[in-house]
């Protein structure tokens, strides 16, 4: 029985890692042993930051809603409580979009919420 060598398999594995490491600085883009560490760390950062992005955007939406609501004499927590009492189910992403782009529609939502404070 002949010996099974893994030349093609390891070549493809190296090629895959080096392709992922394209654009890295120094030996991280050319040397397999360095590249594999950098690619693994990069994938860890990507995984972590996909979750952090959700957190960051929620904070951004809250800041935008708070700024827009303060122009109408309310604060964010009062506004969100009033929306719940008024049974208006609009998520923060849509509210922030309305606050930035459609002031008239946002103002009407604020007036409806003010009626339930």
Swiss-Prot record:
UniProt cross-references to InterPro entries, sorted A to Z: Ribosomal_bL20 (IPR005813), RIBOSOMAL_L20_CS (IPR049946), Ribosomal_protein_bL20_C (IPR035566)
Molecular function, one GO term: rRNA binding
Keyword Zinc among UniProt keywords: no
Highest rank taxon of the organism: Bacteria
UniProt keywords, alphabetically: Ribonucleoprotein, Ribosomal protein, RNA-binding, rRNA-binding
Swiss-Prot/TrEMBL GO biological process terms: ribosomal large subunit assembly; translation
An example Gene Ontology CC term for this record: ribosome
Pfam families noted in UniProt: Ribosomal_L20
Recorded coiled-coil stretches: none
Classification via Gene3D superfamilies: 6.10.160.10, Ribosomal protein L20 (1.10.1900.20)
Recorded family membership: Belongs to the bacterial ribosomal protein bL20 family.
NCBIfam families according to UniProt: rplT_bact (TIGR01032)
Purpose: Binds directly to 23S ribosomal RNA and is necessary for the in vitro assembly process of the 50S ribosomal subunit. It is not involved in the protein synthesizing functions of that subunit.
The protein, known as: Large ribosomal subunit protein bL20
């Amino acid at each position: 029985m002949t010996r099974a060598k893994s030349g093609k398999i390891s070549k493809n594995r190296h090629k895959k890692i080096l392709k992922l490491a394209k654009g890295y600085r120094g030996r991280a883009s050319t040397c397999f042993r360095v590249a594999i560490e950098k690619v693994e760390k990069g994938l860890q950062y990507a995984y972590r930051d996909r979750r952090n992005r959700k957190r960051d955007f929620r904070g951004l939406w809250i800041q935008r809603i708070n700024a827009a609501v303060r122009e109408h004499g309310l604060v964010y927590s009062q506004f969100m409580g009033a929306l719940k009492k008024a049974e208006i189910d609009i998520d923060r992403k849509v509210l922030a979009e309305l606050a930035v782009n459609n002031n008239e529609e946002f103002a009407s939502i604020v007036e409806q919420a003010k009626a339930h404070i």
